[in-house]
């Protein structure tokens, strides 16, 4: 009888241990599979300090802009401008009745041109020769002023020569029916051309830019980025970035907008995409675009919002601020 009681007690203890172990194992597996990791993450806030922009190498107009800058640099060469001014001054000719034009041309070529320093007047060999250069007797050096640039000095000399020609024509020393007035007008046009060359062209902002950034302290994985872009109709192509063509699936159709990596150099290396991660993406559209700009912008905005939702990021405007209704109206005003 005592053995039966002892057996029942041991069986009950064994059953209790098995039940306890089963409950503990089930709870541990449940916590491992269904653990809520969002409670341990920091608050999701957009990245405030973003200094990245569209890489210059990805802009199709970068080559043209670089070529334009080289052209401006060559145009601003002081030596070249000085030579052009001297050539313009040598073209100023005043022919008097009865004077040999060849002898007068040789005198003009022998006459020195101002190069920033005053020169002594040349003694005339003929009584009828006209001194068209400015007399420097009244020029006093101003030591308190800063030295002028070669462009300013050459322009000043040209203005003095033009004023001297006009004064002599008004006094009757030069035949007013000759081609002197025409050459004076030529000198004025040369000065206007030099002043226009000094002006820098203002580049217009002809590109719409939107950003998709990850929450603070997080990054987008490369395989997720590529999968999301392909699902939205992007195709990997030129410049090693993704493009959205006018006709989805047809890479021969024109590109409407593109997406690049926000981090330099801005490309997507598909051979190393499993090790790739980024803090954000930049979507840009050149204006004017192929087709209707308003329709293309709405497609760009909708695609950007879907991409941000798929990756769990935020949409920012070109000023790296949260894209709101005011930003939407501002962008629509630019494409309208």
From Swiss-Prot:
One of its GO terms (biological process) is division septum assembly. One of its GO terms (cellular component) is cell division site. Residues 24-336 are cytoplasmic. SUPFAM superfamilies: Cell-division protein ZipA, C-terminal domain. Pfam families: ZipA_C. The chain crosses the membrane at residues 3-23. Its main location: membrane. Disulfide bonds: none annotated. The keyword Membrane applies. Essential cell division protein that stabilizes the FtsZ protofilaments by cross-linking them and that serves as a cytoplasmic membrane anchor for the Z ring. Also required for the recruitment to the septal ring of downstream cell division proteins. PANTHER family: CELL DIVISION PROTEIN ZIPA. This is Cell division protein ZipA. It comes from Actinobacillus pleuropneumoniae serotype 3 (strain JL03). The gene is zipA.
């Amino acid at each position: 009888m005592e053995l039966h009681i002892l057996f029942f007690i041991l069986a009950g203890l064994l059953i209790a241990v098995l039940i306890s172990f089963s409950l503990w194992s089930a709870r541990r597996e449940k916590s491992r599979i269904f653990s809520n990791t969002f409670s341990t993450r920091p608050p999701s806030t957009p990245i405030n300090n973003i200094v990245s922009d569209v890489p210059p190498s990805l802009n199709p107009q970068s080559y043209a802009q670089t070529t334009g800058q080289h052209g401006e640099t060559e145009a601003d060469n002081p030596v070249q401008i000085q030579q052009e001014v001297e050539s313009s001054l040598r073209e100023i000719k005043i022919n008097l009745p009865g004077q040999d034009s060849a002898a007068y041309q040789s005198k003009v070529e022998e006459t020195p041109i101002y190069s920033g320093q005053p020169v002594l007047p040349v003694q005339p060999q003929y009584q009828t020769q006209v001194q068209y250069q400015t007399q420097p007797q009244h020029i006093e050096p101003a030591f308190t002023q800063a030295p002028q640039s070669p462009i300013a000095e050459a322009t000043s000399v040209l203005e003095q020569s033009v004023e001297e020609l006009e004064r002599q024509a008004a006094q009757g020393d030069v035949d007013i029916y000759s081609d002197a007035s025409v050459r004076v007008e030529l000198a004025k046009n040369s000065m206007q051309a030099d002043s226009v060359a000094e002006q820098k062209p203002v580049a217009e902002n002809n590109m719409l830019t939107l950003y998709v950034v990850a929450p603070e302290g997080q990054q987008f994985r490369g395989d997720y980025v590529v999968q999301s872009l392909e699902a939205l109709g992007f195709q990997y192509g030129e410049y090693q970035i993704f493009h959205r063509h006018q006709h989805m699936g047809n890479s021969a159709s024109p590109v409407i907008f593109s997406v690049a990596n926000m981090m330099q150099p801005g490309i997507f290396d598909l051979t190393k995409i499993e090790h790739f991660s980024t803090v954000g993406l930049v979507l840009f559209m050149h204006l004017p675009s192929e087709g209707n700009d308003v329709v293309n912008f709405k497609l760009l905005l909708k695609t950007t919002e879907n991409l941000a939702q798929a990756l769990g990021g935020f949409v920012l405007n070109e000023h790296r601020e949260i894209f709101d209704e005011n930003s939407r109206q501002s962008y629509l005003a630019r494409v309208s």
